[in-house]
Regions:
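Short, low-complexity disordered leader/linker segments with a strong preference
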Residues: 1-29
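A beta-strand-loop signature enriched in Asp, Gly, Thr, and Trp
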Residues: 224-258
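Periplasmic-binding protein-like
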Residues: 157-165, 275-299
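An extracytoplasmic/periplasmic, membrane-proximal ligand-sensing/linker region
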Residues: 183, 291-337
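Early extracytoplasmic/lumenal segment of secretory-pathway proteins
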Residues: 22-92, 337
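Extracytoplasmic ligand-binding site segments that recognize negatively charged/polar headgroups
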Residues: 35-42, 61, 77-216, 248-250
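A bilobed periplasmic-binding-protein/Venus flytrap-type ligand-binding module shared by bacterial periplasmic
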Residues: 131-138, 252-265, 284-287
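A ligand-binding cleft/hinge motif common to bilobed small-molecule-binding domains
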Residues: 88-92, 212, 217-237
Length: 337
């Protein structure tokens, strides 16, 4: 039986041993916060875990909730990586100091400069194009040209749009501010609102369904929504048109990821991020959601490639975040709800 003196000596040692085991990284796991749906991301995590033996523990939630959670957790966060959609969200997380810069040759080679943070705090993993859709029964393709042209009187009562409350149209307007200046961009948005055939819709699918039903003739959507509808209805009476060709190019955005500032398992997070930007994962990622791979060495899914090639906007996608506050204020002034 231990006497009092021995207990006093042993207790600090036991306490130190206990504390040293708390909050320490697990070499066989990586923790990911993601706003991507389970069916779009879990197959990738499973494949990587099978190859490496490293388990991926992930939490799925809305991007805003995940960013707030990272903020609240601070240095005690268990998260090693944040994966989310839209460069605006990634920019915001970086602006809050939630990421750390990553200097990795493989990542820099895999992800083009305009699809990643200038300070390498986050990297694009897939590319989503936001372009025009139209009714081939009521619109001649020759009538179509640019996003800006949809503000012209010829489209009065013919345009459908998604609500401005979703980040996708905020990012589009942010890039317009960067290219055109605030005054001209606002004129365009006011023209859009004046040309609406109906109230704005909650999502891109509803925009295309309205076009198919004859409620309007033209709209602006992310192409993967078009691909999903087309997969379920090959006879969908809606077509894609690549906007701003020979001009600024089609507006593109990303889904992407960054390693968190206080990542407990940084090495595992870097290995996962590097793998996600590589050819195997890029092919799977793009096919799962009918998006474009960020890595230019990887071909698009055949269903996506069938839509044809297009010239994309070369602006760095970080503009979507840097100009987002201005874009939201502009849209509000213009009556775009």
């Amino acid at each position: 039986m231990l006497n009092g003196k021995r207990v006093l000596l042993v207790l600090p040692l036991l306490l130190a041993a206990f504390l040293s085991g708390c909050g320490q990284p697990d070499r066989d796991e990586v923790v990911v916060y993601t706003s991507r749906a389970d069916h779009l991301i879990k197959p990738l995590f499973d494949a990587w875990s099978e190859q490496t033996g490293v388990r991926v523990r992930f939490t799925t939630d809305q991007e805003g909730a995940l960013i707030s959670r990272l903020q609240a957790e601070g240095a005690n966060s268990p998260a090693d990586m944040l994966i989310t959609v839209d460069a605006g969200n990634l920019w915001y997380a970086a602006d809050l100091g939630l990421f750390q810069p990553v200097e990795d040759e493989a990542l820099l080679a895999a992800v083009p400069a305009n699809l990643r943070d200038p300070a390498n705090q986050w990297f694009g993993l897939t590319v989503r194009a936001r372009t025009l859709v139209y009714s081939p029964e009521r619109v001649d393709r020759d009538e179509l040209s640019t996003y800006e042209a949809l503000a012209e009187p010829a489209w009065a009562g013919r345009l459908c749009l998604r609500t401005s409350r979703k980040v996708y149209n905020q990012s589009l307007v942010a890039t317009m501010i960067e290219r055109l200046g605030e005054q001209q961009a606002e004129q365009v948005v006011r023209g859009w609102i004046g040309n609406l055939a109906t109230d704005v819709f909650a999502n891109d699918n509803s925009v295309m369904q309205a076009i198919a039903a004859g409620q309007c003739d033209v709209g602006i959507v992310n192409t993967y929504y078009y691909g999903r509808l087309l997969r379920n209805n090959p006879d969908l009476p809606v077509k894609l048109f690549w906007a701003n060709q020979g001009d600024s190019g089609v507006h593109v955005n990303i889904s992407g990821a960054g390693i968190t500032r206080h990542a407990p398992n940084r090495d595992n997070a870097l290995a996962l991020l590097r793998w996600l930007a590589g050819e195997e994962a890029q092919s799977k990622l793009a096919a799962l959601n009918l998006e474009y791979p960020a890595n230019p060495a990887v071909d698009s899914d055949p269903a996506v490639a069938a839509w044809g090639e297009f010239e994309a906007d070369s602006l760095n996608v970080e503009v979507a975040g840097r100009r987002q506050v201005e874009a939201v204020k502009l849209m509000d002034r213009a009556g775009y709800r």
